[in-house]
Amino acid sequence: MPYPHQTDKKEPGQKGGPVEILSPAGSLDILKCAFAAGADAVYAGGACFGARAFAQNFTEEELLEGIDYAHIHGKKLYLTVNTLVKEREFDQLYNYLLPFYRQGLDAVIVQDMGVMEFIREQFPHLPIHASTQMTVTNAISASFLEQKGVTRVVPAREISLGEIRQISDRTDLEIECFVHGALCYCYSGRCLMSSMIGGRSGNRGQCAQPCRLPWRAEHDRKERDFLSLKDLCAIDLIPDLVRAGITSFKIEGRMKQPSYVETVTAMYRKYTDLYDSLKEGKQDAFRVSAEDRRILMEAYQRRGYTDGYYTRHNGREMLSLNRPAQAQKKETAVKTGKEQPLQKKINGKLILSPGKSATLILSAALTGGHAEVTVTGDTVQEALSRPLSREQLQKQLQKTGNTEFAFQDLDIRTEGDIFLPLQSINALRRTGLEKLKDRITDSFRRTDDVQKVPCIPCSAPSKERPLGEIPLFVSAMSAEQAWAALSIPAVKRIYLSDTVWAQGGAQELLDKARSRQVEVYVSMAEIYRREAEDFYGKHLDAIARNFDGAIVKNLESFLLLKEKGFSKPVDTGASAYAWNRRACAFWRDLGADFTEAPLELNAQELGDLDRSRMILPVYGYFPVMVSAGCIRKHTKACTRKAGWTSVTDRYHKKFMVRSECLYCYNILYNPDPLVLFGQEKEIRALAPGALLCGFTWESGERTREVLEMFRKWHCGGQAPQWEEGFTRGHFKRGVK
């Protein structure tokens, strides 16, 4: 038998239904404020596993109460579990989610592929939303996630309306997109800057936002906010967003004040409803009033506003380059008239007959049905002097106070002159409202028998291996680096950037590698969007013929290779996150051969994973950001050719920036290289499947020098003394 709230009618946020207004809730009070202002749903974080670790967040009791409050009022609550999860945390994750699952949690928002698989196994009836932290950029990956049981996708904030439209056309997924609030400079889920600078990982909800500080670009003497975007405000684009197939308008701001959430929610509610109310053919008349725009802008003032990436790939106008003199954040309370918590309208019938128990029947409309309860109280007496009037009874019953309910219609039926003590009437009302609340919330409870699934066992523990027995792989961004790698006998595999192939002249290198029995894999794009789709549409056949395999940095590239029948081995880079055994199994089941170790796990945490096919980076400047923005374009130094520039932070650390014009994105690299030379004890104990030296802007000569140092150490020699600045990354410390 279906629960009262279940229906075939499309609800807000569902494909084919009304657009959902999804608001942030940093506390129970803000949750109630958001619903009163018109939100259809809220997203909230609990004590752990959320991407806002420094927000107030909810206690377990508050979340349970919030779930019930949402359901009483026909709303929804989505829980954020949108961080990467370590292997030893899965027992905690199970215990954390179980009470919310049973309470009737509406969905969970996830980033980690291992967590996605875990929830499918452990909590089969819990809808899964793919977080923007997954960096979903096209219909290929969205469709795959749909097949994996995901019901909603939050695509990367950088994709265009056209790309969103493709996801909508090719899947049945709900599509949730940000319409208001802060924008990151980096593709969400791809930023390691805060992690590497100060140990606070964005992938663990602890971003310190160093990007918001002033930076100095190579071609600009003045410090500016080169890595800080204005806040998003897409209210004028509501018609375009709806036509693109977006089903949920998401407002950013779980660390914002109630006044902000109330004002922004009310404005998007008002103008989404306005657009819905316009008749076909008259929707071009949609306009936002100047007064409402002012109210919306004043709700939070810091960086200025942009309508984001929906209609552009990037642009200098999106940056808050010139910080105002009063750059402190300012939130303005704007009265919308919706400050009071919601009270659900209910109907009641009171039946009072002398000599019989007082009877109260309460009912409430629910989506797809209704809930009804009947309660009885004390025996009604015949009045001897002052009978109770209908007005007295009505006044007493309507004192619902701070409960979730208010009477819409109250039918009072009495026989003759009756009397009942006021405390009896109050008790009858309280009992009735409590039972009605229970009847509504119980309809959302999950009572299925949830059994804890055993953890995925690690394959046979890796035995300690002598350093010299672990093969060396090299990644090269230039032909010169690859040629240098070929001169070192220890090198067994080269990952060659696809941009080298695009420039031509790689064939001789490939032939030489083949003659020396060195494998060459193509290293695919950091982000797979239309530019990458166009490139591989033209070159994949030739690449498949000439390369020995591929290494991918994202799910989209992997799925493209599978779709096109690429039959050679495919490895995954560090950004195809595999923090736990389930995530490793996810990539392995997809067909991955080797998997690069995550850069944010320490040696002990890496030891919890299967290392037999793990690639351990031991040298290299690794990416800390991948951005759709372009530093050279923003500093008016764009040559429309791929190349290098740099930005310098307040501590005079220089971060090299690669402008990758083939795919139109920038990659920012850590200022110091990762160097694990000298960590042979830990490396031998880990016994990874391969070691990796990665080269970015190094010359061919410098590449050869580094590899020669590695070769001597690899063969049992003393670790070289690194004279320049370097980092051990998280190999020793890890992230919290």
How should these model regions be labeled?
Residues S131-T135:
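Ser/Thr-centric signal marking residues that sit
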Residues F58-L63:
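Glycine-rich, highly charged phosphate/nucleotide-binding loops
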Residues P2-A37, A41-R52, L64-I67, H73-Y101, ...:
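Surface-exposed amphipathic alpha-helical tracts and adjacent flexible/coil segments at the periphery
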